[in-house]
Amino acid sequence: MKTAYVVDAGVAVKWYLPEIHSGHALRLLRKRFDLQAPELIQAEFGNILWKKCRAGEFEGTTAGEILDSFMRSPLRVHPHRAILSLAWGIAMKHRQTFYDSLYLALAMTEKARMVTADRKFYDALAGTPAERHLFWIEEVP
């Protein structure tokens, strides 16, 4: 049975764009883990590409190709409905965005670990019981 990891959009975008920690993110793909995310990742990933296009980092056609490639990635996408209440509780308890809390709620539900490149989110949950469901991107085995 493959080890399951929930990845956020900040990790997934590093599969396609050379950024800090891209090597760590790519290891997730190369080792063929069971990669999962809430369906929100598709919108967040597209928005990251849109922002980079607006900033002039690359053309829209390139972003479209990256988005197409992402949609073919070995990422198992889950609907939100079953994790909404848990995500809300996480967001309120830890004062984190509902968006980020959806990823953590999925990790908890799937008995997986969430891999994040969002330092602020990771640090906010350090020292809490939720930390056992988190991996900082540099901790990827």
PLM features: what roles do these ranges have?
Residues 1-4, 104-141:
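Acidic, PIN/NYN-like endoribonuclease modules and their adjacent C-terminal/linker elements
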Residues 1-41, 52-65, 120:
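Short, well-structured N-terminal submotif of metal-dependent ribonuclease cores
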Residues 24, 44, 86, 123-124:
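Phosphate- and divalent-cation-binding pockets in alpha/beta enzyme and binding domains
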Residues 41-42, 62, 83, 103:
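Short, conserved alpha-helical segments within structured domains
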